């Protein structure tokens, strides 16, 4: 039986996906989520200003500077832990 991913792992993956801008469909497929599950995460990331919504022909979500800093910190912690 495969264990569920942690909330932090999902958020980290979503921040990574949104670095170059991503629509909701791309986030859903690349993060292996469904549309019902992804909405609360998008709302949380928008509320915390870790991503921003950019309106154009399609609505794109892009990781903010604050989100990139958080992602870098998460990746640093993961690399430190993997060396133990």
Regions found by a protein language model. Name each.
Residues 1-12:
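Short alpha-helical segments that sit at the start of domains
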Residues 18-23:
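Short capping segments at the starts of secondary-structure elements
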Residues 26-30:
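A short acidic, leucine-rich amphipathic alpha-helix
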Residues 33-47:
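Short amphipathic alpha-helical interaction segments
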Residues 46-55:
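A short, conserved structural fragment
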Residues 57-74:
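Basic, amphipathic "hinge/linker" alpha-helix immediately C-terminal to the N-terminal HTH DNA-binding motif
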Residues 76-84:
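Amphipathic alpha-helical dimerization/coiled-coil segments
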């Amino acid at each position: 039986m495969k264990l569920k991913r942690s909330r932090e792992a999902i958020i980290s993956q979503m921040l990574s996906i949104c670095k170059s801008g991503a629509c909701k469909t791309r986030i859903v497929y690349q993060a292996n989520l469904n549309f019902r599950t992804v909405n609360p995460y998008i709302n949380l990331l928008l509320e915390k200003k870790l991503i921003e919504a950019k309106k154009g022909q399609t609505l794109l979500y892009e990781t903010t500077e604050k989100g990139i800093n958080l992602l870098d910190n998460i990746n640093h912690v993961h690399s430190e832990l993997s060396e133990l």
